[in-house]
Regions:
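Transmembrane helix-bundle signature of multi-pass secondary active exporters and lipid flippases
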Residues: 24-78, 141-148, 208, 243-308, ...
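Short alpha-helical transmembrane segments in multi-pass integral membrane proteins
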Residues: 1-23, 80-146, 192-250, 306-371, ...
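Short runs within selected transmembrane alpha-helices of multi-pass transporters and secretion channels
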Residues: 73, 77, 141-159, 167-175, ...
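Short loop-to-helix capping motifs
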Residues: 127, 163-164, 274, 354, ...
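Small-residue-rich hydrophobic transmembrane alpha-helices
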Residues: 52-111, 115, 148-167, 280-343, ...
Length: 463
């Protein structure tokens, strides 16, 4: 009787290597994308305080919608990863074409909603010039939203067939383009019109269409895409396929919206305590967000690793890949937490020369160090769960964690409302909100870890 073929042996080293190869180009791309926002703020700050305020307000609306669209479009990552693992390569072109139709629709809806969101500016007591510039910033930059949504469809396609290099190269080129066109249009160099903060919006909107074009060109030209090339023929929308991807993608979008809007709400609530509190909070949050790019990139890679393993009918490897990814994220979190604890004063001084802001920022960075472990765990576990094509449960957990625990607890500690019987004697201001964020992230991490354990065990058992 012939021996049955042995299952491949999984080793931590090979899985870590595979996940790192997938993730590091995406990390470089994420950092370049973040760099565009940093460049917008830094370059506009040299024009005037009013222009900087307008760009900051406009970017806050834009970024919330951008991250939400990113989540809605993420369903293609899971679908293509499963098809790749199952070696169903002939199915992938159809999925990509439908994802592009979905991206066009999602992008147009997001463009409309982004413009409607500017109505908020009329009710928050802005100076007329700041209101007008912030609204114009949003109106212009929203024109890039359809391109961004379609780009994210192609982003999910290329990363899920293990082709992550274009993501890095195109994002870096996009950053360079953004900085150059900012220089032209913000300051009116080389005879171009001096648009101030609106010049950032023009640069970003054009840059998004160019990034979409660059990705299309790369897919058309590179040999790695020949087996799954999606542009062999025209295909009308298949509403059943698009509906299936929306069914997976909308919960991810809601999750991202809940998280980003919670952090945005904290920033607005902290604003009542004055410039020092707001500045220290924003610096600590900015640095924590920068560090978060690493576990976020591991998370996108995890969707691919887990999805491909499930596609090939190997739930044991999927579970192994998931926990190795969680362990990698935790290992990085330990290092980043140690770094923040050791260098929190240096980090604060790098951002500001104001002694009062430095002192409070160094204090808030203690909380940032504390939630590194929870934040890395929740993003890794939720991404792994999405690799199983399960998106509603992470949404429910994260909405509960941020809006059911983090914000209410933060508001009680930060604002000390008189009507609440267990409020602190004095408002803890920004520190109180950070305690709430640590609590919310920890609850999310614990519940998502339990969910991943239960889900992966059921799949291994064949249920």
């Amino acid at each position: 009787m012939p021996a049955s073929p042995a299952r491949p042996v999984f080793t931590v080293r090979t899985e870590m290597s595979a996940l790192w190869r997938l993730s590091w180009p995406m990390l470089a791309g994420q950092l370049a994308t973040v760099g565009m926002g940093v460049a917008d703020v830094a370059m506009t700050g040299h024009v005037s305080a009013a222009e900087l305020a307008a760009v900051s307000l406009g970017a806050s609306v834009w970024s919330i919608m951008l991250v939400t669209v990113m989540g809605v479009m993420m369903a293609i990552n899971t679908v293509v990863a499963h098809e790749t693992g199952a070696a169903q390569y002939e199915r992938i072109p159809h999925v990509v074409r439908q994802a592009l139709w979905k991206g066009l629709g999602v992008g147009l809806v997001a463009c409309l909603l982004t413009n409607l969101a500017t109505l908020v500016f009329d009710h928050i007591g802005l100076e007329p010039a700041v209101n007008a510039n912030a609204s114009m910033f949003v109106h212009v930059i929203s024109l890039g939203m359809p391109a961004f949504a379609c780009y994210r469809a192609l982003y999910g396609y290329t990363t899920s067939i293990n082709q992550t290099k274009p993501v890095m190269v195109i994002a870096v080129l996009g950053l360079l383009f953004n900085v150059f066109v900012n220089w032209l249009l913000i300051y009116g160099n080389w005879g171009m019109p001096k648009l101030g903060g609106v010049g950032c919006a023009v640069a970003t909107a054009i840059g998004m269409w160019l990034m979409l074009g660059a990705m299309l060109f790369w897919i058309h030209s590179a040999p790695a895409y020949r087996q799954t090339y999606p542009f062999t023929h025209w295909e009308w929308p298949n509403w059943r396929e698009i509906g299936s991807m929306l069914h997976m993608g909308i919960p991810i979008g809601v999750t991202y919206f809940a998280e980003v809007s919670a952090f945005g709400a904290v920033s607005l609530l902290v604003a009542r305590f004055g410039v020092v509190q707001v500045s220290a909070h924003q610096i600590a949050l900015n640095f924590a967000s920068l560090v978060f790019m690493v576990p976020l990139s591991f998370g996108v890679g995890l969707i691919t690793r887990v999805g491909q393993a499930l596609g090939e009918g190997n739930p044991e490897r999927a579970r192994f890949a998931a926990w190795v990814g969680v362990a990698m994220s935790l290992a990085f979190a330990v290092l980043s937490a140690g770094f923040i604890l050791a260098f929190r004063w240096q980090i604060a001084r790098a951002y500001t020369s104001d002694p009062a802001v430095q002192q409070l920022c160094a204090h808030l960075l203690l909380f940032a160090a504390l939630f590194q472990l929870s934040d890395a765990t929740q993003v890794a576990t939720s991404s792994a769960i999405r690799g199983y094509k399960v998106t509603r449960q992470p949404m429910q957990i994260q909405v509960l964690a941020f809006w059911g625990f983090a914000l209410p607890v933060g508001a009680i500690l930060g604002l000390a409302p008189a009507w609440f019987p267990w409020s602190p004697a004095q408002p803890l201001a920004a520190a109180g909100f950070w305690i709430g964020l640590v609590l919310g992230l920890t609850i999310a991490a614990v519940l998502l870890t339990w969910s991943l354990h239960a889900l992966s065990a059921r799949r291994v058992a064949g249920r």
